[in-house]
Amino acid sequence: MGQLIAKLMSIFGNQEHTVIIVGLDNEGKTTILYRFLTNEVVHMCPTIGSNVEEIILPKTHFFMWDIVRPEALSFIWNTYYSNTEFIILVIDSTDRDRLLTTREELYKMLAHEALQDASVLIFANKQDVKDSMRMVEISHFLTLSTIKDHSWHIQGCCALTREGLPARLQWMESQAAAN
């Protein structure tokens, strides 16, 4: 009986998917990861290296790698690309000065062979802050409309309040089911 249940789970649910959470420092990557996991704000020191957590949903679970990107070690991201199905790019919507760097990093990732089939979810974080950039402005600056080879979605959010986060896990789950 146990083997039958295990077989049914392998066919109909409990699929594992690898996710990398990337972005420049202080964008909110770790806060978003732990909001998904615990639904609480976890106050932490800046991440050194990476964090990995498993987010379990009824039919899917995601292994999420929160990867720091120190300027001198940007090449380190490549080591996490193998088997990645989803890229979550976190952007600080208040930081116009580093948006060019974010765009360059995004297109480097999308050009990488190991990520050719990855779906992209962009969180425009800190939407609760006055004068933050809106989705239209960020989409335009990142030239998201030119991305044709990857499924992508941009979502405004506030990691501290969790606004905009839950529905995106559902988007990832539906993307995973479609593939």
UniProtKB/Swiss-Prot annotation:
Annotated membrane-spanning segments are: none
Lipid-linked residues (N-myristoyl glycine): 2
Keyword annotations from UniProtKB, A to Z = GTP-binding, Lipoprotein, Myristate, Nucleotide-binding
| Gene Ontology process terms (BP) | intracellular protein transport; protein localization to Golgi membrane; vesicle-mediated transport
One Pfam match: Arf
Please explain the role this protein plays, according to its UniProt record: Binds and exchanges GTP and GDP.
**Protein name as catalogued:** Putative ADP-ribosylation factor-like protein 5C
Q: Which organism is it from?
A: Homo sapiens
